[in-house]
């Protein structure tokens, strides 16, 4: 597997990603040929980076697959354009970093097989860990039940306190309305 990186290219990363997605997983020779006829600045740049990655690995372009073609955002040049009434509006000139990784079909198949073997080994380790974790989860479940019971009792206490508080508010309102009605009736009698 070899790679090539082109940094600080004056190109919009969003426009370059459209081309990069088309190329990913293709044969390098076919990708370069198709990019030659794509009327896009990003296509010309990405084809050069693919050719560089193939040359870096010392491969023949017919035997190589593009494993990944990634376009990351670089810094943005900020310029200003003068406008009417003394104003200026910003102009963004973005840059991009392009990373291409290529590999032969044989190396790709070997890496896939090795990752499958690693995954099988990890499953065996996980099954042993799951037996131990069952014991831990049982003790955690017991503690959660205790916590839930405590929470329900505290919630019941809080609900009873709110009922008492609401009753007090209701009695104070009724006494206040009685006092105001007494004052009104006394005022009418005078």
From Swiss-Prot:
Pfam families: Ribosomal_L22. InterPro entries: Ribosomal_uL22, Ribosomal_uL22_bac/chlpt-type, Ribosomal_uL22_bac/org-type, Ribosomal_uL22_CS, Ribosomal_uL22_sf. PROSITE patterns: RIBOSOMAL_L22 (PS00464). GO terms for cellular component: cytosolic large ribosomal subunit. GO terms for biological process: translation. Residues 167-178 have a biased composition (Low complexity). Residues 111-190 are annotated as: Disordered. One of its GO terms (molecular function) is rRNA binding. The keyword Protein biosynthesis does not apply. Keywords: Ribonucleoprotein, Ribosomal protein, RNA-binding, rRNA-binding. CDD domains: Ribosomal_L22. Residues 125-147 have a biased composition (Basic and acidic residues). Belongs to the universal ribosomal protein uL22 family. Part of the 50S ribosomal subunit. This protein binds specifically to 23S rRNA; its binding is stimulated by other ribosomal proteins, e.g. L4, L17, and L20. It is important during the early stages of 50S assembly. It makes multiple contacts with different domains of the 23S rRNA in the assembled 50S subunit and ribosome. The globular domain of the protein is located near the polypeptide exit tunnel on the outside of the subunit, while an extended beta-hairpin is found that lines the wall of the exit tunnel in the center of the 70S ribosome. PANTHER family: CHLOROPLAST 50S RIBOSOMAL PROTEIN L22-RELATED (PTHR13501), LARGE RIBOSOMAL SUBUNIT PROTEIN UL22M (PTHR13501:SF8). This is Large ribosomal subunit protein uL22. It comes from Helicobacter hepaticus (strain ATCC 51449 / 3B1). The lineage of its organism: Bacteria, Pseudomonadati, Campylobacterota, Epsilonproteobacteria, Campylobacterales.
């Amino acid at each position: 597997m070899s790679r090539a990186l082109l940094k600080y290219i004056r190109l919009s990363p969003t426009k370059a990603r459209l081309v990069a997605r088309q190329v990913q997983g293709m044969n390098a020779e076919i990708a370069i040929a198709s990019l030659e006829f794509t009327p896009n600045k990003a296509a010309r740049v990405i084809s050069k980076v693919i050719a560089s990655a193939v040359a870096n690995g010392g491969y023949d372009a017919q035997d190589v697959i593009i494993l990944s073609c990634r376009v990351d955002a670089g810094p943005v040049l900020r310029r200003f354009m003068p406008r009417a009434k003394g104003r200026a509006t910003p102009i963004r000139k973005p840059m991009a970093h392009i990373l291409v990784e290529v590999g032969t079909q044989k190396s790709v198949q070997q890496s896939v097989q090795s990752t499958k073997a690693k995954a099988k080994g990890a499953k065996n380790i996980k099954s042993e860990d799951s037996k131990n974790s069952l014991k831990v989860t049982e003790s955690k479940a017991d503690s959660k039940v205790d916590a839930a019971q405590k929470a329900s009792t505290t919630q019941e206490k809080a609900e009873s306190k709110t009922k008492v508080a609401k009753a007090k508010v209701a009695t104070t309102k009724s006494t206040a309305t009685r006092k105001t009605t007494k004052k009104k009736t006394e005022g009418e009698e005078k």
